[in-house]
A protein has these predicted regions:
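A long, amphipathic alpha-helix that forms part
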Residues: 14-15, 179-244, 248-252
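Secreted, luminal/periplasmic, and some membrane-associated catalytic domains
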Residues: 18, 88-101, 107, 212-215, ...
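His/Asp/Glu-rich, glycine-adjacent segments
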Residues: 75-215, 291, 297, 308-312, ...
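A short beta-strand-to-alpha-helix junction
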Residues: 105, 190, 223, 278-295, ...
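Low-complexity, glycine/alanine/valine/leucine- and proline-rich hydrophobic stretches
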Residues: 349-410
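Short, structured active-site-proximal loop/turn typified by the sulfatase FGly-forming signature C/S-X-P-X-R
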Residues: 34-78, 122
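Short catalytic/ligand-binding loop motif for oxyanion handling, primarily in non-cytosolic enzymes
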Residues: 30-32, 65, 129-135, 210-214, ...
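Active-site-proximal N-terminal segment of extracellular/periplasmic enzymes that hydrolyze or transfer
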Residues: 2-53
Length: 414
């Protein structure tokens, strides 16, 4: 590898002495770690906090899975890489398109640039929706790259993933999508890849099924973090550089009777502006709606008549639980969003509220526990835990989760 590698106008070290490992622990906020630590369930993470770094940083807005995973692996916000939700809307065609195809990426990943410089890359993600985005720019024909998901671990091939027969290799069956097992598979695979494949860079991305269902301190949540800690201990070998962060936090979003706490914005705008005059887009929506019912804290709104923007904003602002209501240009500048993939208006809800489209459009039949969700400013703050001291923080300003690889790679040079 060269002495330095430039990725999206940021300079990263080219010569690594150990493996740089970043883990995106989906849906994690500091309270999960704190509660598990009180019961002495996380000795390895506690050691990181004591001897390395225990920081709180911002995730990208919207605080959803796709934008933040891609921010972490490009080192930049979605204004640069283009992935600003799980899906987006094209007004000219009326299409709502899942944003999991690499054609929507506008910037290379750190993996791609390091791979092109000769590095070995290992990536394991819980859900397959991220896999093609994460592996974009990698080739799997020279034994230098591996990328697969827990969800479709039984469908891997050398050509597509750089590995085959993962379940036999790992000794674990394909986990249920809605289970702790999906994330445990990621961690177990990461440990085995570290010791056998010996990558220069490794990225492990879990799923937030547990965090959507269980609050910090609940027994199931504590069990999850104890499991995670065990694998962290197995990754913390040979002076490897490890940073644990998250794509977003999580907040309770239910009424006292257990039903979801939501403002159905499409219904409101249909009444105030007229039918078919607006389109409310909820970028949290993806194929895995069982645990959130497509309700999150962020929405973007397209208007048929652009002259109605101020009127629409004034109507939305009548609801105190919609805390942020901004025009496209103001919101995109403030939160580093791609203007052409956002609507005319951008909204974020209060801490315990979500934004829905039409009440009849949301299916809660599979939502067994009180709703916990994310997407806005109240779920933005996430942990940033390093096993090594960071001596060269670029600024005293708050860091972002997408600084993780910058500091993990720096830590791998010593």
């Amino acid at each position: 590898m060269t002495a330095a590698i430039e990725v999206n106008d940021r300079i990263y070290p080219g010569t690594l002495k150990s493996t740089a490992i970043v883990i995106c622990l989906d849906g994690s906020q500091k309270e999960y770690f704190e509660e598990a630590s009180k019961l002495k369930l996380t000795p390895n993470i506690d050691s990181f906090k004591k001897n390395g770094e225990d920081l709180l940083v911002n995730s990208a807005i919207p605080s959803f899975t796709n934008p933040n995973n891609i921010s972490i692996v490009t080192g930049r916000p979605s204004s640069i890489h283009g992935i600003c939700g799980n899906f987006f809307y094209t007004p000219s065609t009326g299409e709502e398109v899942m944003m999991n195809d690499p054609k929507f990426l506008r910037a290379p990943t750190i993996f791609q640039k390091y791979y092109e410089s000769g590095a070995k890359i290992a990536i394991v993600t819980a859900k397959d929706k991220l896999r093609k985005l994460l592996s974009h720019g990698l080739a799997f024909d020279d034994a230098r790259a591996i990328c697969f998901s827990s969800e479709k671990s039984d469908q891997v091939s050398l050509n597509e993933n750089g590995i085959e027969e993962v379940n036999q290799w790992l000794g674990m069956e394909v986990p249920e999508v809605y289970s702790q097992g999906l994330s445990e598979f990621v961690m177990a695979a990461g440990v085995k890849l570290l010791h056998e494949f010996k990558p220069d860079i490794m990225y492990l991305s879990t799923t937030d099924f547990i965090q959507h269902k269980y609050a910090p301190g609940e027994e199931v949540a504590n069990t999850f973090y104890a499991m995670f800690d065990k694998y962290i201990g197995e990754l913390n070998t040979n002076n490897n550089s490890i940073i644990i962060t998250a794509d977003h936090g999580m907040q309770p979003k239910s009424k006292s009777d257990g039903t979801p706490n939501a403002i159905y914005l499409q219904d409101i705008l249909d009444e105030k502006l007229g039918k078919n005059e607006s389109k409310v887009i909820l970028p949290i929506t993806d194929p895995y709606v069982v645990h959130h019912g497509a309700l999150g804290s962020f929405a973007t709104i397209y208007l048929s008549d652009k002259s109605m923007v101020n009127h629409a904003i004034s109507e939305i602002k009548k609801f105190d639980d919609i805390e942020i209501v901004l025009t496209n240009d103001v919101a995109c500048e403030k939160y580093h969003l791609p203007q052409d993939r956002m609507g005319d208006i951008i909204c974020m809800s209060s801490k315990y509220m979500t934004i829905g489209s039409s009440e009849t459009a949301h299916d809660f039949t599979n939502l067994k526990e009180p709703l916990r969700s994310h997407g806005g400013l109240h779920e933005r703050e996430v942990p940033f835990i390093s096993n090594k001291k960071i001596t060269s923080l670029e600024s005293t300003d708050k860091l972002n989760n997408y600084d993780a690889f910058y500091y993990a790679l720096e830590g791998a040079t010593s």
